[in-house]
Swiss-Prot record:
Role noted for this protein: Catalyzes the uptake of tartrate in exchange for intracellular succinate. Essential for anaerobic L-tartrate fermentation.
UniProt keywords, alphabetically: Antiport, Cell inner membrane, Cell membrane, Membrane, Transmembrane, Transmembrane helix, Transport
InterPro entries on file: CitT-rel, SLC13A/DASS
Transmembrane segments: 10-30, 33-53, 54-74, 93-113, 137-157, 189-209, 236-256, 292-312, 313-333, 340-360, 370-390, 393-413, 418-438, 465-485
GO molecular function (one): tartrate:succinate antiporter activity
Ranges per topology, Periplasmic: 1-9, 114-136, 210-235, 361-369, 414-417, 486-487
Gene: ttdT
Topological type in the membrane: Multi-pass membrane protein
Cytoplasmic side of membrane: 31-32, 75-92, 158-188, 257-291, 334-339, 391-392, 439-464
A Pfam family it matches: Na_sulph_symp
Name of this chain's protein: L-tartrate/succinate antiporter
Tree of life domain: Bacteria
Amino acid sequence: MKPSTEWWRYLAPLAVIAIIALLPVPAGLENHTWLYFAVFTGVIVGLILEPVPGAVVAMVGISIIAILSPWLLFSPEQLAQPGFKFTAKSLSWAVSGFSNSVIWLIFAAFMFGTGYEKTGLGRRIALILVKKMGHRTLFLGYAVMFSELILAPVTPSNSARGAGIIYPIIRNLPPLYQSQPNDSSSRSIGSYIMWMGIVADCVTSAIFLTAMAPNLLLIGLMKSASHATLSWGDWFLGMLPLSILLVLLVPWLAYVLYPPVLKSGDQVPRWAETELQAMGPLCSREKRMLGLMVGALVLWIFGGDYIDAAMVGYSVVALMLLLRIISWDDIVSNKAAWNVFFWLASLITLATGLNNTGFISWFGKLLAGSLSGYSPTMVMVALIVVFYLLRYFFASATAYTSALAPMMIAAALAMPEIPLPVFCLMVGAAIGLGSILTPYATGPSPIYYGSGYLPTADYWRLGAIFGLIFLVLLVITGLLWMPVVLL
């Protein structure tokens, strides 16, 4: 696309800000709160349209608010307080997101992913599973699922995991059986494998807190709005029954609903064995990496009372440097990690301002009035269903979470009977599971969709079927199990 045709992407966020700012201030809101909301909405529109990278959009929004803080961030009463210096206060607010523990947890998890990639451990694990389970097509589907499952806790970029590690391996498998893309032979085995690749990525993105960056963004938004939070262990235990069910059910379900013509064969295990032989035996760096990852997972699950999850990640990264699993250059050159670090911190800052200015509490009270008369369970389920289905309108999980999660949290806070930890975990699971709905919902989706093995009609049909199944199972486990372990 030529730059001359992109001007509207730059103007649209500014137009949204201007339109909202010029509208009458709703009853119950202060003028500065409404102006803040106008800029916040403009940032969300910018994240959706992306005239520049998302991190830049968020940083520009923060800069505008901080510079104009006497009119956007602080009330007249705050400004009138003796000794109140808005310049210092606005700077403190602008950088507050960078001190959030969630930011450092996800940054550490990115470094874990770098360790997996640098040592080759992630590729080795996937190849071993393919070798052991690849004799039957159904078991090959489970090998793809288990590969994603093992990598997910320490790979917070589902794009890096699905498109960067898993896809380059499984794209080599169909041609071994003469299953070619954009050909009638694609249904032989290739279509099943590619569908398993994207559906496994979506499932594992919901299972672990650190499996997808928007999961951590949600926790940051939750904490800024309510001071409540969910630990890594809380998320894992709350998702446990649904996780087990999906991991065991999905490969079989895909096998039934999108059956491959070829049911078994020996070519895939032979290829995997050849690749493993080329890699050689497990080296000392891989062993050290494996030991550190096991230790981190144990502390994340069981060590919450003794050490913060972010501190676990921070310490493990330090050990990875000392043990020369990764180098300092690997850290400073990791563009993906720094990109997520900046946009996630900036979005948490913006969400904190939305709460500090009083917008969240006002919106919550507004919703409380409209939702009165309905049971908390009915409201919670209705909100989850609406949140889930709105995934169709977003091509970015980050924009989706940034735009809708604050409103969902405000709605839950408006009804004290709704258990916030349970509701937020259901919202978090919906982010990952709902990514299966469309071929543009998350980073790996276009990769698998463009593989030539998943025709458009098949993708949309399967996305709707699997999406509905995921939603039903999420609601059931959310109502029956999550309150048991989270409340």
